[in-house]
Each structure stands twice: as C-alpha cells, then as structure tokens.
C-alpha cells in the first residue's frame, strides 16, 4: 500500500512537472510573440517620428515663405500709396496753375494775348495731354500687374494656410498615435514584467517539485535496499535453521539420548546467544538507518519550508507594494474630495458678515443647602455614624490659627476625626450625581472644591472596601493605605492653602498630626445633632 501511494505521488509529481514545462513553453512562445510585436511597434513609432520631423521642416519652410510674401505685399502697398499720393499732389498743382494762368490772362490786354503764340501753347498742351495719357495708362498697367500679383500671392497664401492646417491635423493625429503606442508599450511592458514574475514562480515551483521527486526517489531506493537486505537476512536465517534441524536429527540418530540432549541444549544456548546478538545488531542498524532517513526528511522539509517562506515573503512584498499604491491613491482621492467639498461650501455659502460674539456665560447657581440629605454626602456619613456606635476610636486634630478653644471646636475635631477614620476604613459614600447634574459646569477653571471631591473619590476607589462577610468592628488601617491617604491629604491641604491663603484660617485643619484614641460610646441626641450641624458647616466651608 505504501509503495502504491508513493508511486501515485511520483506520478502526480511527474504530471505536474510536465504541465509546468508545457506552461513554461507556452509562456516563452507568448513572450517571443510580444517581443516581435514590440519591435514592429517600435519601427512604426520611428517611422511616425521621421514623418513628424519632415512635416515640421515643411511647415517651417511654408511659414518662412508666407512671411516673405507678406513682407513683399506690405512693401508694394506702401509703394502704391506713395504713388497715389504723388499723383493727387500733381493734379492739385496743375489745377492751381491753371487757375492762376486764367487770372493773369484776364488781367492782360488783348494785344498781349494776341501776341502770345497760341500754337506753342497748343503744342505744349498736346504734349502734356499725351504725356498725361501715357502716364495714366502706364499707371493702370502697373496697378493691374500689382493686382494680379496680389491675387496670386493671396491664392498661394490660402493654399499655404490650408497646407498648414492639414499638417497640423496630421501632427495631432500622429501625436495621438504616438501616445496610444506609448500606452500600448507600457501595457506590454507591464504584462511582460508580470509574465516574468509568473515564469520565476513557475521555475521555483518546478524546482520544488523536482526536489520532492528526487527525495521520493531516494526514499524508494532506501526502502528497496532495506527490503532486499531484510529478505537476504531472512533467507540466511531459514537456511541456518534448516542446517541446525538436520544436524540435530543426525546427532539424535548417532548419539544417545542424554548426550544428544546435552549437546542440543548447548548448541541451542549458543545459537540463541548468537541470534540475540545478531538481532540487536540488526535493530541498531535499522535504528541508524531510520535516524538517517528522518534526518534527511527533516532537512528536506526544512528546505521546502524555507522555499515556501521565500515565496510567501515575495508575495507579501508584492501585496505591501499594492497596499502602498492603494493608500497613496486613497490619500489623493481624499485630498481631492476635501478640496471639492471646500469649493462647494464656498460656492453654496458665500462669505457673510462676522458672527456676533457669544453671550457671556450665566452666573453659577447658588450652592445647595447643607441640610439636604439627598444632595449632601456628609449627611449619609453622619447617618452611618449614628447606626454604627460600636466604633471606639477618636482622632485629635490640631487646627491652625485657632485662638479660642470652645466645646464646639472639640466636637468639630471629633466629627472630622471620625469622618477621616471612616474614609480610611472604606466607608462607601453615596454618589453625588444629582448635584453634579443640577449645577451646569461653566467655562471656569477647576476650583479647590472640585479638586477635593475628585481626590475623595480617588481615595474611596483606591482604599479596599470591606466585604459582606467582614465583621462590623473597627479594622486598623494598613501602612500602604495610610501612606496613600496622607499623600492625598497633603495634596488637598496644599490646594486649599493656595486657593484660600488668608480667608478662613480656622477651617484649614492640620491633618498630618493624626492620633488614634478611644471615643466614649454613650452620646445623647443633643450632642449628635450638634455634631451633625458642625460637621456640615465645616465641610460646606471647605467645599465652598
């Protein structure tokens, strides 16, 4: 079964290698075809460029000729205008001379006029008329020639303009063709690059398949060698067994029963000893061969895994390159979208007048009354103090700047001490969500009261609260809790000092000098009410 499976694997590997080779050959043929097409396109591009150069040279020549013709036309126009101006001047001069002569003739006497030779004048007039006629005809001829030349030049100019337009159209067409060819060339180059990558992958896969095929062939050879060696060893063992059987039969026949048995037992012991030795040697050889095979298989697996990792790394690099391209395109698109949005906003919302300044914030509401049990957390503290009268500890607090030592101050100190002990031992205060919801926070800076509430909440969160199974009796605070609480109180005291330097010195309590003392268990209701009133007043003074 194993040999059949290996043969099937070998066949599949051979089929895959053949398929890979066929695909490789087909890709090579396609590559050659694409190369030929690229060469043809390059030749066509060169021809188009040559034609473009010819068209450009012809167009430059045509432009030069047109410029020269235009210059000649301008010169002829200037000459004609000058000739016409001179002719008009001569006509005016002749008219003025005729008028003057007529005036002089009217002033002269009849005798003088008769003496003047009229024939000479007639001859002169005839000559002048002939000269004028000749000059006017000549001018007409020159003008007609110039007009003919102008018409010819204009016709040539029109033809040259038509030729220029045609050449420009051809240039635009050739440029479009060049752009198309360049685009096709880029596409072909990209396809060839991709095909080269595919060919490289196919080569690697084919090498991988060939390596697997070689490894399978080596495994088959090793298995065949081992099988042949095992068959030879088994055949030799059978021959030796047959020989031993024959020898034992001969010995049994020739020697007596006792001696034969002894000899047979001795031979059997020696044979078993040798057989065990050979079996152990054979097992060691088999183990060594198996270790060699395993090591070779592990090496092959390692090489295969390394190749697979190389392929995966290349694919990962390709995907990373594509990802970076996609990210750059996405960034460009986002930038364009943002610009378009800004333009749309500018078009839809024209710039208006500057908005009016915001109204001033409303004044903060007055603080809640201290006697309300729902909004004041100290009332909950005092209720807990009333319920739990088993607590027999007391802290003596020394106030700063205390000039009068009255019983009210002692009660205050006791209340504050008991409150601090409760805070140390983890008394759970009620949430102050109602007061925070009622009072709307303004744009002011955080005051000392807010910082004090936040510090109390942080202390309550950090201090370990007693579980439901713990006894209600007093528990001594741990040194870590005491150090944390002392730090928090020190910070609170510094904040209060900075906020209220000299406004209320009697309310600032030195909380560093804390001492644990026993409190009297029996207290009447009047003392409790005074204690409640004093504690609420102290806390409201410190929080306000």
UniProtKB/Swiss-Prot annotation:
GO cellular component terms attached to this protein's record: axon; axonal growth cone; cell leading edge; cytoplasm; filopodium; growth cone; lamellipodium; microtubule associated complex
Record field: compositional bias (Pro residues): 352-371, 469-479
Keyword Coiled coil listed: yes
Region (Disordered): 343-544
InterPro entries: Shootin-1 (IPR024849)
Start-end of Polar residues biased regions: 499-544
Coiled-coil boundaries: 17-100, 141-184, 259-349, 480-504
Predominant subcellular localization, coarse grouping: other
Subcellular location: Perikaryon; Cell projection, Axon; Cell projection, Growth cone; Cytoplasm, Cytoskeleton
GO molecular function: actin filament binding
Keywords attached to this entry: Cell projection, Coiled coil, Cytoplasm, Cytoskeleton, Developmental protein
GO BP, sorted A to Z: actin filament bundle retrograde transport; axonogenesis; Cdc42 protein signal transduction; cytoplasmic actin-based contraction involved in cell motility; endoplasmic reticulum polarization; netrin-activated signaling pathway; neuron projection morphogenesis; positive regulation of axon extension
Biased composition (Low complexity): 372-383
Function of the molecule: Involved in the generation of internal asymmetric signals required for neuronal polarization and neurite outgrowth.
Family to which the UniProt record says this protein belongs: Belongs to the shootin family.
Protein name: Shootin-1
Gene: shtn1
């Amino acid at each position: 079964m194993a040999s059949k499976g290996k043969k099937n694997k070998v066949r599949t590997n051979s089929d895959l290698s053949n398929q890979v080779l066929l695909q490789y050959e087909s890709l090579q043929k396609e590559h050659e075809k694409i190369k030929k097409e690229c060469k043809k396109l390059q030749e066509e591009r060169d021809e188009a460029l040559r034609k473009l150069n010819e068209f450009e040279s012809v167009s430059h020549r045509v432009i030069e000729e047109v410029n020269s013709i235009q210059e000649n036309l301008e010169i002829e126009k200037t000459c004609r205008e000058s000739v016409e101006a001179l002719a008009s001047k001569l006509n005016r001069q002749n008219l003025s001379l005729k008028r003057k002569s007529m005036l002089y003739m009217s002033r002269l006497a009849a005798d003088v006029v008769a003496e003047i030779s009229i024939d000479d004048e007639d001859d002169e007039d005839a000559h002048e008329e002939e000269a004028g006629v000749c000059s006017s005809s000549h001018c007409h001829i020159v003008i007609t020639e110039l007009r003919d030349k102008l018409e010819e030049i204009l016709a040539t100019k029109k033809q040259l303009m038509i030729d220029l337009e045609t050449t420009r159209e051809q240039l635009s067409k050739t440029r479009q063709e060049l752009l198309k060819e360049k685009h096709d060339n880029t596409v072909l180059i990209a396809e060839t690059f991709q095909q080269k990558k595919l060919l490289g992958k196919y080569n690697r896969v084919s090498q991988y398949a060939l390596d697997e095929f070689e490894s399978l062939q080596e495994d088959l050879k090793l298995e065949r060698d081992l099988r042949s060696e095992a068959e030879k060893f088994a055949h030799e063992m059978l021959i030796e067994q047959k020989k031993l059987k024959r020898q034992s039969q001969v010995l049994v026949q020739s020697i007596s029963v006792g001696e034969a048995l002894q000899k047979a037992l001795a031979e059997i012991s020696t044979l078993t000893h040798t057989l065990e030795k050979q079996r152990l040697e054979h097992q060691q050889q088999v183990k060594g061969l198996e270790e060699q095979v395993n090591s070779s298989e592990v090496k092959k697996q390692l090489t295969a895994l390394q190749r697979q990792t190389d392929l995966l790394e290349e694919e990962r690099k390709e995907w990373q390159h594509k990802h970076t391209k996609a990210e750059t395109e996405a960034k460009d698109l986002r930038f364009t979208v943002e610009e378009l949005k800004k333009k749309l906003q500018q078009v839809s919302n024209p710039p208006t007048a500057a908005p009016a300044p915001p109204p001033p914030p409303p004044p903060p509401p007055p603080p809640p009354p201290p006697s309300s049990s729902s909004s004041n957390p100290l009332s909950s503290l005092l209720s807990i103090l009333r319920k739990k009268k088993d607590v027999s500890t007391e802290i003596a607090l020394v106030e700063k700047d205390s000039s009068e030592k009255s019983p009210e101050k002692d009660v205050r100190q006791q209340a504050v001490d008991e409150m601090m002990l409760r805070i140390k031992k983890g008394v759970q205060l009620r949430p102050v969500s109602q007061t925070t919801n009622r009072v709307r926070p303004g744009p002011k800076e955080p005051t000392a009261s807010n910082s004090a509430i936040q510090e109390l909440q942080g202390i309550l969160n950090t201090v370990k609260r007693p579980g439901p199974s713990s006894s209600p009796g007093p528990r001594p605070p741990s040194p870590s809790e005491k150090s944390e609480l002392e730090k928090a109180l020190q910070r609170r005291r510094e904040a209060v000092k900075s906020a209220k330097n000299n406004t209320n010195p009697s309310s600032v309590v030195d909380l560093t000098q804390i001492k644990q003392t026993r409190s009297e268990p029996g207290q009447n209701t009047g003392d409790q009410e005074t204690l409640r009133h004093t504690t609420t007043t102290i806390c409201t003074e410190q929080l306000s």
